[in-house]
Amino acid sequence: MAEFSQKRGKRRSDEGLGSMVDFLLANARLVLGVGGAAVLGIATLAVKRFIDRATSPRDEDDTKADSWKELSLLKATPHLQPRPPPAALSQPVLPLAPSSSAPEGPAETDPEVTPQLSSPAPLCLTLQERLLAFERDRVTIPAAQVALAKQLAGDIALELQAYFRSKFPELPFGAFVPGGPLYDGLQAGAADHVRLLVPLVLEPGLWSLVPGVDTVARDPRCWAVRRTQLEFCPRGSSPWDRFLVGGYLSSRVLLELLRKALAASVNWPAIGSLLGCLIRPSMASEELLLEVQHERLELTVAVLVAVPGVDADDRLLLAWPLEGLAGNLWLQDLYPVEAARLRALDDHDAGTRRRLLLLLCAVCRGCSALGQLGRGHLTQVVLRLGEDNVDWTEEALGERFLQALELLIGSLEQASLPCHFNPSVNLFSSLREEEIDDIGYALYSGLQEPEGLL
């Protein structure tokens, strides 16, 4: 009953509004004429329809139908052609083509009429061309900056070595040698650290290496440096015995000593003034990092305390801030053997493996979702691909890039990336499941549209 009353009231209001419209239109014809009255009538009906939509309840289906109708009207509305620029108005207008209904006549050619110039087609670059442009703009470092960075790193190494010899005269350190990607042609942008090796000179015959899997840590990445010959050379015979923990040379104790020295004892303002730059030790990182600011570049120097060549395999072990039971162990540094292997493979067939590695490093640094993929992960991927006997010329760089993305996605699906030189080490073991999902999704999206990564 209420609905009926509502419809009846609505009908009465419609009739009243309709009579008012008729009255207005009738009088408008006298004043405005027929054309003006028509315009006024259309405007009045539009207002009436707007009022009806706002006041009357409507069914959901009717609303959706009207919405789709309005959308179709918008799509069907012809777009206005833009007005030609003033310069084009002075150009001669080309004659119109004869219509099909016009009688055919002899074809006349006007040699003075110039053909209309079409706009240039949009530039579509291939993946190969985009990779080369990305390499030129985001990867390549100017030679002047490389030379300046090497000079600063070498000067800092000399100053730091002089300080260590005066501060710890009883500890035999070897020559401080700067190195790393900057020196091996593997620097992708300015994000990589300069590696400053601080080697310990251990007495031959008093130390031996124990694999990490044979220790309580059960970590295949690490090694323990054990003190031997205690019956002939008792504890205290070696200056490094002060860093022993349970009969093993502790990397953690040595790192704590050197971190305190770098943060509190070194006169960095004086050294920086001498070298023409600003040097500050990084207090936020557990690693021994020096932040260098020059007017022409910024540089980070990683001070790496190392134990070189204790065994016949000439392994390089680093004092690294490890957690848990592995805190006193030494991390095996694979960078030297990785860089040497990539160089040997490229020299054999004039390949582009190292260029592919630089591209991958720059892409991952430029994408926040891929930030967890470090140089170590990407180097292993390139090494696995690099051992295959495929085309490694510059023309195949785009194909190898996509192949590297596919290999990364496959490894993430299995949550396993074995080390090329030690398959028992899974380089994805430190990633959480959420991080693996995020990286996998970003790589899958990049595989569908590789240009989006560049």
Swiss-Prot record:
User: Principal place where this protein is found?
Assistant: mitochondrion
> What membrane topology does the annotation report for this chain?
Single-pass membrane protein
Q: Where is the composition biased (Low complexity)?
A: 88-103
Q: Name one GO cellular component term.
A: mitochondrion
Pfam families registered for this protein in UniProt: Mab-21_C, MID51-like_C
Source species, domain of life: Eukaryota
Q: Which PANTHER family match?
A: MITOCHONDRIAL DYNAMICS PROTEIN MID49, MITOCHONDRIAL DYNAMICS PROTEINS 49/51 FAMILY MEMBER
| Family of this protein | Belongs to the MID49/MID51 family.
Disease tied to this entry: Combined oxidative phosphorylation deficiency 49: An autosomal recessive, mitochondrial myopathy characterized by progressive muscle weakness, intermittent muscle pain, exercise intolerance, elevated serum creatine kinase, and deficiencies of multiple respiratory chain enzymes.
Q: Any idea what this protein is called?
A: Mitochondrial dynamics protein MID49
Gene assigned in the entry = MIEF2
